[in-house]
């Protein structure tokens, strides 16, 4: 098994995430967020000669991290197309699915991708670099109410309406093209002691909108339930409350909102069952990789 790897961080919660799949040597597994390939390589170590791993990543940079292994296939597509491409590769059912929903360190550390608040860069934030829609479009083309909604729903920012108004006023004078311009525009909302946190929330909101992250996760989860075999495992890492809420609810009752209907005897049939409690990184892992600090792993199996 040969690899060619770009600079990516060590995979978060590597062992517990792969352990959560309860891998069968001859099973078929999916890594829907290939990235640097860390989780994928650990899965391949545990598979036998007849096992199979299909990985997804829409970021063309991830293709540089190729794994030369006959048991491995890398699909350069968004995992919202999970079912379609599994069928294309001859698989209607799989034994387990792994996903790490975080933005990779590589994406954060390449300044021109525009994901990080640390760098001066054009407003971009596209995970799929082939997409025509970027952070520039959200910041400069959304009306005030749309902007306020994005900042409130996805950034959980209390001052979302005021922020949206200030952005709209600023862009009337000139387009907001760069991260530095956006930061200057938001200056009054960034007190020194909370500047980085609030700016990160603003970036998170815009990034989620650009990439339709929550809608993609919903589509993926519904398809995952369809393609998992009975007792098949779902092992997922989320990084903020919006993602985790979707994952938690879906693993508990197969729904994103509301409660499942009861039958005439008051019983509820649910399609999945959580396996154990959620897992977070220990102090040693957080010290080694600070971006792991907000990670939360949940595992479930299909009933």
Where are the predicted features?
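S-adenosyl-L-methionine-dependent methyltransferase catalytic core, i.e., the SAM/SAH-binding region
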Residues: 1-303
